[in-house]
C-alpha cells in the first residue's frame, strides 16, 4: 500500500545533506517536527518546524539525555492507522501521526576508536535515537524510517518521483536497514563493555579494502616481560 508522507520527525547528529532533504519535504507540504540542534538547523533554512518540546509540553532534560522519550512521540510513530482504537486514542490525547522518521545515532564507535574517556563513551550510547529507529521500523506498514544519511538522496528521489508517496516494499527496505543499523550499534556497545577493541588495520585481504581488528588483544598474544 502506498502512503503519502504528511508529517516527519527529524532528529540527527550529522547534518550533512539534511538541508536539501528538508527543503524537499517542505516543498511537498510535509509538517516537520524536530529537536534541539536539528530544529535550529532547519529553522536557519527558513523552513517552518515544530519543536518536540511544544508537542510534549516537556523540555529536554538531564543534559539532553531525555528529549524524545514521550508517549506523544512514540504514540504517533507506532499507531496502526487501520486500528480504530489506536486512532481514537491519538485523538483523545492530541497526538499527531508521524509518517516519516529521520534519525541517526550518536557516534559511539568513533568515540571509542578515537580514544575517548569512559564518561565520553558512555554519553555516546544513544537511547532516544535507537528507540525511535526501532519503533518506526517496527511500524513500517505505516511509517518510513531513514536511519542513515546515505539514504537521503534515495528518499528525495522517491518523494519527487512518486508525489510524496512510498510503497510498503520501499518502507520495508528502509526498515530492514534500520534494524541492521540498530543491531550493529548495539553489537559495538556490547563489545566495548566486554573489553573488545576495534583497531583499524592498514588494509584488508586486498590493499584496497578497509579492515579492522575487533577483539581482546590480551587473548591473542602472549605478554613478553623484560627484566
Task: Describe these PLM feature segments.
Residues 1-55:
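N-terminal glycine-/serine-/threonine-rich phosphate-binding loop
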Residues 3-7, 27-30, 45-48, 70-74, ...:
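Short coil/turn connectors at secondary-structure junctions
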Residues 10, 31-36, 50-54, 79, ...:
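General beta-strand structural signal in soluble alpha/beta enzymes
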Residues 14-15, 36-40, 53-57, 106, ...:
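Short, ordered loop/turn segments at secondary-structure junctions
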Residues 37-107:
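Glycine-rich nucleotide/cofactor/substrate-binding loop typically near the N-terminus or early
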Residues 100-123, 127-169, 216-224:
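A short, charged helix-loop
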Residues 124-125, 143-207:
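Internal gly/pro-rich beta-alpha loop/helix module
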Residues 196-227:
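Long, structured protein-protein interaction/assembly regions in large complexes
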Amino acid at each position: 500500500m502506498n502512503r503519502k508522507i504528511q508529517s516527519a520527525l527529524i532528529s540527527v547528529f550529522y547534518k550533512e545533506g539534511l538541508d536539501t532533504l528538508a527543503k524537499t519535504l517542505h516543498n511537498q507540504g510535509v509538517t516537520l517536527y524536530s529537536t534541539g540542534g536539528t530544529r535550529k538547523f532547519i529553522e536557519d533554512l527558513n523552513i517552518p518546524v515544530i519543536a518536540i518540546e511544544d508537542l510534549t509540553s516537556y523540555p529536554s532534560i538531564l543534559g539532553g539525555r531525555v528529549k524524545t522519550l514521550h508517549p506523544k512521540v512514540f504514540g504517533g510513530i507506532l499507531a496502526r492507522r487501520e486500528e480504530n482504537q489506536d486512532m481514537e486514542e491519538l485523538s483523545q490525547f492530541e497526538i499527531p501521526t508521524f509518517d516519516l522518521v529521520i534519525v541517526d545515532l550518536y557516534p559511539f564507535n568513533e568515540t571509542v576508536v578515537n580514544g575517548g574517556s569512559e564518561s565520553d563513551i558512555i554519553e555516546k550510547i544513544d537511547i532516544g535515537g535507537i528507540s525511535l529507529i526501532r519503533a518506526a521500523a517496527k511500524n513500517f506498514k505505516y511509517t518510513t524510517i531513514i536511519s542513515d544519511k546515505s539514504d537521503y538522496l534515495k528518499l528525495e528521489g522517491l518523494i519527487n518521483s512518486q508525489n510524496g508517496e512510498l510503497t510498503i516494499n520501499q518502507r520495508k527496505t528502509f526498515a530492514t536497514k534500520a534494524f541492521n543499523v540498530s543491531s550493529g550499534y548495539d553489537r559495538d556497545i556490547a563489545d566495548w563493555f566486554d573489553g573488545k577493541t576495534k583497531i583499524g588495520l592498514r588494509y584488508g585481504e586486498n590493499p584496497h579494502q578497509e579492515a579492522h581488528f575487533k577483539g581482546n588483544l590480551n587473548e591473542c598474544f602472549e605478554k613478553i616481560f623484560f627484566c
